[in-house]
């Protein structure tokens, strides 16, 4: 992109700061910039700790959305999951019930392994959400949990078995440990499918995760990969089921 074109992009940029309904791991607001271009709107909102190379991919994704071209849509709607933060059981159940009844979600992803909480807290939260699913008479209900890399290998082995029981069967557990080596070892000792999320941040990461037998599923976020077109290439090369996820985006992102 030329300096002149970049100046045009920045001239049509609008900063934003949106409060989160529920704080997430110390984050209370999402801050970023909305780009307005001939193709629509793009969102540039990398996290503050990211380096320049990572931020450049997020910017490329935003520019693609505002100035580039996406592939034609293949469907008019896609299923989504409700997300339950690391809340107390009663609050988690109430939030889940609203997602099931009000929003029509059949699948819920529950945050676990929160700093300062225990496995007992996680088990109680999952049991409460499962009860809410049953009360809402959700057809073909599914429960996923997301540890955001918060467990050691030993803790993950115990926690996954307990949470699988509490859920009546987990669909999968997302990023239970931090490294691909830990995920690969964990896959050998638990029966619940493992999804890699934080381990997938560049185009080559899904391939490495599969080659190292570290994931049954890969979670793809578009901004870290540089845009929709690059993300499609990653999905095609992964060779395992893919879940497309957000990155704490606004309604634009």
Which stretches of residues belong to each language-model region?
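N-terminal capping/lid subdomain adjacent to the active-site entrance of alpha/beta enzymes
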Residues: 2-157, 161-166
């Amino acid at each position: 992109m030329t300096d002149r074109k970049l100046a045009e992009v920045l001239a049509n940029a609008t900063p934003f700061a949106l409060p989160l309904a529920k704080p997430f791991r110390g984050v209370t607001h999402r801050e970023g910039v909305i780009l307005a271009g001939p193709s629509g709107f793009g969102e540039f909102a990398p996290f503050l700790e990211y380096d320049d190379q990572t931020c450049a991919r997020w910017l490329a994704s935003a520019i693609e959305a505002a100035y580039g071209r996406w592939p034609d849509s293949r469907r008019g709607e896609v299923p989504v999951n409700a997300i339950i933060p690391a809340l107390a059981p009663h609050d988690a159940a109430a939030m889940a019930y609203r997602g099931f009844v009000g929003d029509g979600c059949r699948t819920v992803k529950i945050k676990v392994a929160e700093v300062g909480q225990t496995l007992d807290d996680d088990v109680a939260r999952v049991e409460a959400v499962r009860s809410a699913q049953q009360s809402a008479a959700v057809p073909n209900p599914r429960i996923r949990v997301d540890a955001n890399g918060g467990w050691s290998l030993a803790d993950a082995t115990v926690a996954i078995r307990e949470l699988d029981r509490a859920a009546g069967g987990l669909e999968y557990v997302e990023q239970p440990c931090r490294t691909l080596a830990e995920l690969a070892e964990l896959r050998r000792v638990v029966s619940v499918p493992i999804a890699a999320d934080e381990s997938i941040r560049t185009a080559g990461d899904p391939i490495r995760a599969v080659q190292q037998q570290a994931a049954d599923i890969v979670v793809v976020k578009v901004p870290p990969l540089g845009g929709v077109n690059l993300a499609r290439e990653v999905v095609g090369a992964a060779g395992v089921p893919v879940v497309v996820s957000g990155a704490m985006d606004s309604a634009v992102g």
